[in-house]
A protein has these predicted regions:
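Long, charge-rich, low-complexity alpha-helical segments
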Residues: 1-44, 98-100
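A short, well-structured beta->alpha microelement
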Residues: 36-59
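E1/E1-like adenylate-forming module used to activate ubiquitin-like modifiers
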Residues: 59-151, 161-167, 189-221
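Phosphate-binding loop/pocket of nucleotide- and phosphate-handling active sites
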Residues: 2-21, 168-235
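Conserved beta-strand scaffold positions in the cores of enzyme catalytic domains, especially
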Residues: 45, 89, 185-187
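Structural motif
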Residues: 24-29, 47-50, 65-70
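Short amphipathic alpha-helical face segments that pack within enzyme cores
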Residues: 33, 150-158
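A short glycine-rich beta-strand->turn/loop micro-motif centered on a GG-aromatic cluster
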Residues: 47-51, 92-93, 181
Length: 235
């Protein structure tokens, strides 16, 4: 006598994310600890220890790179991803004596990382020499549990600034104008405990963000540069 097989158990419907989706891009042990603490149910964590490949980064509303000091290559790749997709981005670095979070890059409304790096060098900062970085790789920093908490707090603060428009931004939106958003850099001195926040001033004629105040800016021109034979379709 044949029997009817039991019906398969009902699978719960996958819920859509209720808030912005964040792509966390960790490089190194400290970064993985911070990303694990921050990532929510709808967020994605993509390790970038071997490099940041934009094709591997799924859809997200914003991207956060957490890395060891002086990872300029990763930061520039993040800038490219950010401006191509029109997606806000942020970086967190652990230095021997400080945590640095920023700049908060908002394509079309803020300066980019390249501007920040140039301004920092103008003020005397000297990163790790490229030949040392290529020979020895990233200089991974030792960290304690409270460093993870502080780093997660800085990222949360930056994302809150992104999600909560200020009075100046609301006034600009009502006047049908585009107000600058982002560009902030937050730092915590791990010796004194002093926390600071400073803006990033864009460099004139920057190749990445010189059109940052154009309200209609999007990623199509950058895409067209990769597909010259189809440039007329997106002009």
């Amino acid at each position: 006598m044949s029997t009817t097989p039991p019906a398969p158990a009902a699978q719960p419907a996958q819920q859509a994310p209720t808030g912005p989706v964040t792509a966390y891009l960790p490089q190194g042990g400290f970064a993985r600890a911070v990303a694990t603490r921050l990532a929510g149910d709808g967020d994605v964590v993509i390790p970038v220890d071997q490099g940041l490949v934009s094709a591997y980064i799924p859809y997200a509303d914003r991207a956060v790179l957490i890395a060891d000091p002086d990872q300029s290559g990763l930061r520039e790749d993040l800038d490219t991803l950010s401006f191509t997709r029109g997606m806000p981005s942020l970086g967190l670095e652990l230095f021997p004596t400080e945590l640095r979070c920023g700049p908060l890059v908002v394509p079309g409304r803020s300066a980019c990382y390249r501007c920040y790096d140039r301004r920092r060098r103008q003020h005397g900062y000297r990163p790790l020499p490229p030949e040392v970085a290529s020979e020895h790789g990233p200089l991974e920093q030792a960290y304690a549990h409270h460093h993870v908490l502080l780093g997660a707090g800085l990222i949360s603060l930056a994302l809150q600034a992104l999600d909560t428009p200020g009075p100046q931004e609301q006034a600009a939106e009502s006047a049908d104008d585009v107000a600058p958003i982002g560009g902030q850099v937050w730092t915590i001195d791990l010796v004194s405990g002093i926390t600071t926040c400073s803006p990033t001033v864009a460099v004139d004629r920057c190749e990445t963000c010189s059109g940052r105040y154009e309200g209609r800016r999007d990623g199509l021109p950058a895409l067209a540069a990769l597909l010259p034979e189809r440039r007329g379709e997106v002009a």
